[in-house]
Amino acid sequence: MSRRSSRLQAKQQPQPSQTESPQEAQIIQAKKRKTTQDVKKRREEVTKKHQYEIRNCWPPVLSGGISPCIIIETPHKEIGTSDFSRFTNYRFKNLFINPSPLPDLSWGCSKEVWLNMLKKESRYVHDKHFEVLHSDLEPQMRSILLDWLLEVCEVYTLHRETFYLAQDFFDRFMLTQKDINKNMLQLIGITSLFIASKLEEIYAPKLQEFAYVTDGACSEEDILRMELIILKALKWELCPVTIISWLNLFLQVDALKDAPKVLLPQYSQETFIQIAQLLDLCILAIDSLEFQYRILTAAALCHFTSIEVVKKASGLEWDSISECVDWMVPFVNVVKSTSPVKLKTFKKIPMEDRHNIQTHTNYLAMLEEVNYINTFRKGGQLSPVCNGGIMTPPKSTEKPPGKH
């Protein structure tokens, strides 16, 4: 054997100090096996997360509607985010630009309450262009439907908040659908009111009463089916800050004195119903959806008070509401040309709450006057509201016996 071979053989033999005992070798081998198992387990968990997808399990009831879903197992798919174009609509929005006009509250932080209201305003989106999604619909159909819902609310002495919740549910639901047939509008409208009444009213009308006011057009089963469709489409987000909620807040903040009692109304009921009537008329026009509810309410308040009151009550500057104030001018002219609305007395409704009960007047005729004025303001011909085929609920004396 050569000297070189002897050196290589000696080098490959373990030195006495480097020799491992059998116990140490077993421990090292167990650690290696555990590490390998942990890595394999983590890979299996990641793979398992990617092995499921959502699939519709029921056929959609409406064209373009949202149906219930199930989670099913699928082959492994790698999830990547290579295309960021779909995130362009999600931009940071500064909600602190409007300081809180709320006074100190005994039951919470006024800044947090105000910020939560602004967040809701941004989350609950509405758009006047939703009729683009529905080729069979015309703007006056929405006006006729909402006018009918106003009348139903008065017949059953429902609160203004109930109507405005129903209006919000209807408008947001229509944004989630496509090509809704005009024959479905009454069902969607009365179901929206049914949902709103269960949220807002202490003694809400029964299901059969909502079916009754449609004069046989909608059955109880139809309303229940549509209720689930609407709730699913809205993702159960049913707590918007409505127009009438903003009006209550603004008038209350303006009326507060040195010792505020925020929980009890401090403002004039007469002032409230005058502005509420203007807002009732405005919301019938589909163009009102171009503005946030807060802006719309502040503009109405400005027409009946002053910009100083608006700044104090809402924290909004003139630049924020000027466009809406100008848009509202024809509505104000029509409202002020009619007899002033008066407080009504309702059975079983306390005097201090009567201004909160929704009332109805000949809003469609008033809206037609607004359209006539806008014809000259905008220099273009606007189609008037059609009075034909208006859905009319029964009179109070014609409600089903034993119902309320």
Swiss-Prot record:
Result of changing T392A: Increase of steady state level
Basic and acidic residues: bias regions: 35-44
A Gene Ontology molecular function term of the record: cyclin-dependent protein serine/threonine kinase regulator activity
A Gene Ontology cellular-component term: cytosol
Subcellular compartments: Nucleus
Expression (tissue specificity): According to PubMed:9858585, highest levels of expression in adult testis, thymus and brain. Lower levels in placenta, spleen and colon. Consistently elevated levels in tumor-derived cells compared to non-transformed proliferating cells. According to PubMed:9840927: low levels in thymus, prostate, brain, skeletal muscle, and kidney. Elevated levels in lung. According to PubMed:9840943 highly expressed in testis, placenta, thymus and brain. In a lesser extent in small intestine and colon.
The protein's name: G1/S-specific cyclin-E2
Keyword match Hydrolase: no
PANTHER family: CYCLINS
Annotated positions of the Phosphoserine modification: S21, S383
Similarity remark: Belongs to the cyclin family. Cyclin E subfamily.
Function of the molecule: Essential for the control of the cell cycle at the late G1 and early S phase.
Compositional bias (Low complexity): 12-26
Organism: Homo sapiens
Induction info: Activated by papilloma viral oncoproteins E6 and E7 which bind to and inactivate p53 and Rb, respectively.
Quaternary context: Interacts with the CDK2 (in vivo) and CDK3 (in vitro) protein kinases to form a serine/threonine kinase holoenzyme complex. The cyclin subunit imparts substrate specificity to the complex.
